[in-house]
């Protein structure tokens, strides 16, 4: 006779946009409540899912997720009102597109490079130029500042893409 282990899903207490999906060998970290959707990455399993702590040293990124993330940003960034407004401050340069692991203390403060998902070119009138999103290869989903957190509008687009 064999034992059957019930697998379950909970919200991650330290980042409420995320869900933890229990598995036999690892815990999937996801923006989706559905454990079958593409996950952000994974951490080793724990006997108590509520005690899982996502740390950079234990977190394994899912490259498929990163591809979807960047495609979603590249497609939707130009119509996201929060970025449209912010672009005015980056006339004639590249605007960093940061996640929200760290909330910036003042206007025009650039996110640290590991928290910058990519860059968009802004013209001299303060308008993002479509098709100019460039991926930041040094971006990490999970680092000493925490795990990825997205603006709500971008999260909605991402959930549709997953």
Where are these regions (language model features)?
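N-terminal interaction modules that seed assembly of large macromolecular complexes
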Residues: 20-73
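Mature, matrix/stroma-exposed regions of nuclear-encoded mitochondrial and chloroplast proteins
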Residues: 58-162
């Amino acid at each position: 006779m064999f034992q059957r282990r019930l697998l379950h899903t909970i919200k991650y207490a330290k980042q409420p946009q995320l869900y933890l999906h229990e598995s036999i060998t690892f815990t999937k970290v996801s923006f989706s409540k559905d454990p079958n959707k593409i996950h952000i990455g994974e951490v080793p399993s724990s006997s108590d899912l509520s005690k899982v702590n996502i740390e950079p040293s234990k977190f394994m990124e899912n490259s498929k997720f990163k591809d979807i993330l960047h495609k979603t940003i590249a497609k939707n960034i130009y119509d996201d009102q929060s970025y449209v407004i912010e672009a005015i401050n980056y006339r004639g340069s590249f605007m960093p597109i940061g996640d929200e692991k760290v909330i910036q203390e003042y206007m025009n403060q650039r996110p640290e490079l590991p928290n910058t998902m990519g860059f968009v070119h802004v013209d001299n009138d303060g308008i993002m130029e479509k098709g100019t999103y460039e991926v930041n290869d040094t971006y990490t989903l999970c680092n000493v500042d925490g795990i990825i957190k997205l603006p709500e509008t971008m999260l909605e687009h991402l959930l549709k893409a997953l």
